[in-house]
C-alpha cells in the first residue's frame, strides 16, 4: 500500500496515476486503505476480490480489471507468507503451502500479467523478491528457496520482456519491519515499508531492473555469496 500511496500522491501533482485497483482477499475490509489513497490524491479506487492461491482464477480476475479500466500502467505484485520454518521441516503440507504462495502463485499471476502487458505494448511490473533468496540460509530455507525461485523467474521474465515496451522492476529488500515480521528481532540493515516504497517508486521512475533495499545489501551479499559453506551454515538469520 505504501507504493500505491506514493503513486497516488504523484497523481495529485499531475505526474502520476488517478485510478487504482486494490486486488486482495477480504477486499471489503480495505476501507482504511481506500480512504488513504483518496486522501493522497487518487480519483478512482476500486476493490476486487483476489485470492493469490486460487491460480485457476488469476486470468479471469485480470481480464475483468482490464476490460473495465482499460490498459494497466503499473502492476505491483505484493503477496506472500513467511511460514513457520520449524513446522515446515516436519510438515510437508505446510512447506508446500509456503512454496505455493511465494513461488507457484507468483509464476501464475506474472505469466498472465506479462501476456496482458505485452498485448498492450506497455506497462510496468513490480515484483518483490528478497535477499533471503539470494543465498538460502539454514534458518529459513523453505521461504528462502521460494524467493530464490521467484527471483530467478522474475529475472528471466524481465529479459523475455526486453523490447516489448514492458518493464519489470525486481525489488530485493532485506528484513522489513512490518506485519509479516511482527514479533521478530530486526536483522542488520533492516528497512521499513516506507523505505521500501520510496526505493520502489524511484526504481520505477528510473526504469531500473533491480533495486536492493537498503542499497548497501548489494555489496554485502556480493561478499555473502563467497563465504565458505561451513561459515555460512553457522550464521544466524
Question: Which ranges hold each PLM region?
Answer:
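Conserved mid-core segment of classical short-chain dehydrogenase/reductases
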Residues: 80-96, 139
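Active-site loop immediately N-terminal to the catalytic Tyr-X3-Lys motif
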Residues: 135-141
Amino acid at each position: 500500500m505504501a507504493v500505491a500511496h506514493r503513486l497516488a500522491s504523484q497523481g495529485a501533482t499531475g505526474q502520476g496515476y488517478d485510478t487504482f485497483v486494490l486486488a486482495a482477499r477480504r477486499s471489503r475490509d480495505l476501507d482504511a486503505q481506500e480512504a488513504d489513497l483518496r486522501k493522497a490524491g487518487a480519483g478512482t479506487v476500486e476493490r476486487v476480490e483476489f485470492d493469490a492461491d486460487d491460480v485457476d482464477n488469476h486470468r479471469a480476475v485480470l481480464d475483468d480489471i482490464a476490460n473495465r479500466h482499460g490498459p494497466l500502467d503499473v502492476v505491483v505484485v505484493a503477496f506472500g507468507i513467511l511460514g513457520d520454518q520449524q513446522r515446515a521441516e516436519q510438515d510437508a503440507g505446510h512447506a508446500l503451502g509456503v512454496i505455493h504462495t511465494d513461488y507457484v502463485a507468483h509464476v501464475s499471476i506474472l505469466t498472465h500479467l506479462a501476456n496482458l502487458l505485452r498485448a498492450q505494448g506497455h506497462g510496468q511490473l513490480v515484483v518483490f523478491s528478497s535477499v533471503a533468496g539470494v543465498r538460502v540460509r539454514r534458518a529459513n530455507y523453505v521461504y528462502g528457496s521460494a524467493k530464490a525461485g521467484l527471483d530467478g523467474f522474475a529475472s528471466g521474465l524481465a529479459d523475455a520482456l526486453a523490447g516489448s515496451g514492458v518493464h519489470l522492476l525486481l525489488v530485493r529488500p532485506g528484513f522489513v519491519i512490518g506485519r509479516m515480521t511482527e514479533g521478530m528481532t530486526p536483522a542488520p540493515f533492516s528497512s521499513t515499508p516506507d523505505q521500501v516504497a520510496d526505493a520502489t517508486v524511484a526504481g520505477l521512475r528510473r526504469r531500473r531492473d533491480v533495486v536492493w533495499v537498503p542499497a548497501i545489501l548489494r555489496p554485502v551479499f556480493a561478499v555473502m555469496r563467497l563465504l565458505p559453506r561451513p561459515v555460512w551454515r553457522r550464521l544466524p538469520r
